[in-house]
Amino acid sequence: MGEIQIKSDVVLKGYWKRDEANAESIVDEWFYTGDAGFFDEDGFLFIHDRVKDMIISGGENIYPAEVENALMSHPDIIDAAVVGVPDDKWGETVKAFVILSEGKIQSEADIISYSKEQIASYKCPTSVDFINDIPRNPSGKILRRVLREPFWEEKGRNVS
């Protein structure tokens, strides 16, 4: 898995009046999409997640979509989002925000235990907040920066 890069005559030449964004996204005429993906054995490209959303915990790369899919397989969870939050030992750790089905009760320990049955333990949330709404943009994408901001305000996100 790696960051998807494209080069073509029909790829944008740059962002209008955004020199810093251009320097980050376009290198030697290659456009770095910001998406992490991979090719399968048949040559099909699969987009897995956004590189900037990747959580780095103890040197391990954790993609939020994988953790969210594991959480969403729980019968009592109707929506979930995860972000990386500061951790003195690991750099970042996974924090989950979960919406439960109406009338359902689960503890933080229940959700963490369930996730350990679904994915590798280093990818599992170390804390869970039960919330009523997950912030999304008009196209339905999770606004991770809104969820992440309160935890990084004092520190500044020190991992890429």
Q: How would you label these PLM feature ranges?
A:
Residues 2:
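Glycine-centered, small-residue-biased loops immediately flanking beta-strands
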Residues 8-9, 13-14, 36-123, 140, ...:
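AMP-binding/adenylate-forming catalytic core of the ANL superfamily
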Residues 29:
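FAD-site-proximal beta/loop scaffold in flavoenzymes
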Residues 117-141, 160:
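AMP-binding/adenylate-forming catalytic domain of the ANL superfamily
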Residues 150-160:
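Acidic/polar alpha-helix N-cap and adjacent early helical turns
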